[in-house]
Each structure stands twice: as structure tokens, then as C-alpha cells.
Amino acid sequence: PIAGSMVLAAVLLKLGGYGIIRMMQTLPTTKTDMFLPFIVLALWGAILANLTCLQQTDLKSLIAYSSISHMGLVVAAIIIQTPWGLSGAMALMIAHGFTSSALFCLANTTYERTHTRILILTRGFHNILPMTTTWWLLANLMNIATPPTLNFTSELLIMSTLFNWCPTTIILLGLSMLITASYSLHMFLSTQMGPTLLNNQTEPMHSREHLLMALHLVPLMMISMKPELII
């Protein structure tokens, strides 16, 4: 069920990050070197989740693995225990909560009209539902972390924290962000561009679906304009 996926990606997945933040407060802040294996594992896990996204054919699985990859960055930023790292982790959890929930919602609107989640069978929607394509584009741009979104601000804070801690981590971070952009564009182009494969009449998007998307993306844009609300 789509509601379960949206709540899982937006709220429950972030509770793990919150738990790590509370747990790290009990540990010494001066000995971050002993957490080196965990930071490397978190970044490596993010890259592996991103690579898994690239080979997904199921739309919902792709979005789910995307959430996992972003949480790898969050965990790495929290473990370093600097103010910038914690601010970036908190901002990324909030930003990606909105983004992944919106993507799951869009995947469901596509599934209701095509009755399939296979990427190659859902293409050509920009000809049939142009407004849906606009929502897809906005959600994917936020997933890629393009400026001036909150996703960009949070990833910039996390990158600065990790680079300041160990400059070598920029290789893993850069690779992770490159793959994120690749699978996000692949997801958008696969579902929206190309000739449509649907022979039946597709019903238009309902007002409730537009409202649901607006309630995801408008608050995120507003927080992006004033990030000090959460950072």
C-alpha cells in the first residue's frame, strides 16, 4: 500500500537517524577517529545503494533504495559530531522525507493508470499528463539536490563536514552524488519521455493528487528559502 511506503520513507526511516543523534550525545566527541570504520561503511553503503538503484527496473524499489542511500550520508554526518554535521543531517532527513514521500506518491499515480511499476512500460507520460511530468521533474530535481533546495543546503553542509574531517571522503561523496544524479535522470526519462505504450484511455490527474503533491513540495520550497527554521 502506498500510504505505508510514504510513512515509512518520510517518518520511520528518519527515526533511526534521530536515535543515532541521541545515542551519539552519550559518546566522547574528541575520539571521532575510532568511528572511522563506521563512517567509511556508511559512505560505502550509500554508494552500494546508489549502484543498486541504477539496475532497478521496478519504480518503487528504485525510490526505496534511493532513501537508503541518503540515510548513509546522514549516518556519516552524525557520527562526526560537529555542529555543521548535525545540522546537515537534520536538514537532509527533513528534506528527503518530503522528497521520497512525494516520489512514492507519484509512483502510485503512475501505477494506478498503467497497472505496472516496470520503468520501461510507464513511459510517454509527458504527452498524456503534462502536469504530472512537472511534478516528476520538481521531485527529481530535489532528489538530485539542485540549488537552492534544502537538499542542496544539507548535502553541502555534510560534504563540508566530511571534507574537513578527512579530504579523501570527497571521492566517495562525489561518486555517490554522481550516481544519484544518474539514476534520478534515468527514472525521469524512463517514466516521462519517449512514445507512450498505453493503448487504453488514461484518466487525468485528480485535484486531490495535485493537492497532495503541492503539500509535499511547497513546504519544502518554503523551508529552502528560509533554512534557519530547522538548521
Curated annotation (Swiss-Prot):
GO terms for molecular function: NADH dehydrogenase (ubiquinone) activity; ubiquinone binding. One of its GO terms (cellular component) is mitochondrial membrane. The chain crosses the membrane at residues 1-21, 34-54, 63-85, 89-111, 128-148, 169-189, 211-231. Signal peptide: none annotated. Keywords: Electron transport, Membrane, Mitochondrion, NAD, Respiratory chain, Translocase, Transmembrane, Transmembrane helix, Transport, Ubiquinone. It is found in: Mitochondrion membrane. It comes from the Eukaryota. It catalyses: a ubiquinone + NADH + 5 H(+)(in) = a ubiquinol + NAD(+) + 4 H(+)(out). It is a multi-pass membrane protein. One of its GO terms (biological process) is ATP synthesis coupled electron transport. Its EC number is 7.1.1.2. Belongs to the complex I subunit 4 family. Core subunit of the mitochondrial membrane respiratory chain NADH dehydrogenase (Complex I) that is believed to belong to the minimal assembly required for catalysis. Complex I functions in the transfer of electrons from NADH to the respiratory chain. The immediate electron acceptor for the enzyme is believed to be ubiquinone. This is NADH-ubiquinone oxidoreductase chain 4. It comes from Cerrophidion godmani (Porthidium godmani). The gene is MT-ND4.
